[in-house]
Amino acid sequence: MATYVRNLNAAINSRNGLQLAHLLAVNPDTNPTAPQTNALAVAAGITNQVWQPVVEAHVLACNDSSTPLERLQAHQAFLSELNRVSEKEDVWILPILYAASTHLRGIGRRALKEIQDKEAKNEILTQLESSSRVVNRTLTLCLNDRHPSLQKSKKWGTYFFVGELCKLYFLLRKRNMSKSVIKVVESMSRDLPPLASYPRSHTCTYSYYRGVLSLMDDDVEQAQNWLTQALNQCFYKSTDNQELILLHLIPVQFLMTNQVPSKAVWEKFPRLHTVYHQMLTALLRGDVLSFDKAVTQRRSLFVKKYLYLAVEKMRVFVFEKLFYRVFLAKDKATRITIDDYQAAAKLVGVDVSPDFLEATVSNMIYHDRLKGYISRERHTVVLRAEGAFPKLDHAA
């Protein structure tokens, strides 16, 4: 214990954030030096009295015999103590704040996954809400840092903690809280370094959540911009993160450009192939029934990942392809009845009403995916002689 305390004092006195983050790690797998001993005894050995409550809270958080709820409370108390001392510290303290907030969220996430009892799970959720307020306090300390030197300012931790809060809020299913945090940061962006100057690991997470939130708000164009940015910022070896980004970007990219992933993408990310390939193949064939079956098989995933709305929007493209096949089968006739479309839908095993088909055609016309108009008296779609299906004609 004496060696451990001596190392703690050295890291605190020399303001060595990375070393202190290692010494105050609350994961025994990454910090075998953390002593399972009396918290007060360890804290009493810290020469800087301001740090004594931090060290005491750290030792208490390392207690493996506590329940998941108690562990979460202890880790929250540890971060709260770090926030207290961070008020008068500069950029050097960020590594330990990063580590503490990440582990706090990890404790909560694992508890939610492992606990089956509904009442116990609700207690964890309530505690996580409290934890999110502590992390929000950490973000506020970064945003409001008035250090005269920007290089030594805690502002460099801003986007990391925005990402941490978004992860917590999504875990709690409170996406509006994520939007509120992002609005606050955007309103203060003039006082922050440019986004591009932050570590890519921070901006990648930020861009990803901006993209997901845009998609949930049905702003597909903004979703494409942010998710593409996140993919470009993602570390090339972080294939799991790339896969998560692409899980959202693939439907967005199709909605915006009609593009589907290349063979190389499918080979690199076989799980994405499992999720999307059957669905996209059916879409490109105009096979409504197979498309619906593929979506139904993955419905729980799409709902969980906030993708269901985007996938439902893709269904319009299946009918567009089906209508195009009818157009070609009729030698590119400029007049096609709604009954013809309904008969084609029945051929692929889908029973839809004439009203639904008219609404689908109207939607295609509105979005410039079909050139023409509907003659409602004759229940006929009148197509332009040239370029009736501009997107599909171009692709062909």
Curated annotation (Swiss-Prot):
| PROSITE patterns in UniProt | PCI
SMART domains referenced in this protein's UniProt entry, alphabetically: PAM (SM00753)
InterPro entries in alphabetical order:
Csn12-like, PCI_dom, WH-like_DNA-bd_sf
Which Gene3D superfamilies does the UniProt entry name for this protein? Winged helix-like DNA-binding domain superfamily/Winged helix DNA-binding domain
Going by the entry's taxonomy, the superkingdom of the source organism is recorded as Eukaryota
Q: Name one GO molecular function term.
A: RNA binding
- List each copy of the PCI domain by range: 204-388
**One Pfam family name from the record?**
PCI
The UniProt family comment states: Belongs to the CSN12 family.
In its UniProt entry, what is this protein called? Protein CSN12 homolog
Which species expresses this protein natively?
A: Yarrowia lipolytica (strain CLIB 122 / E 150) (Yeast)
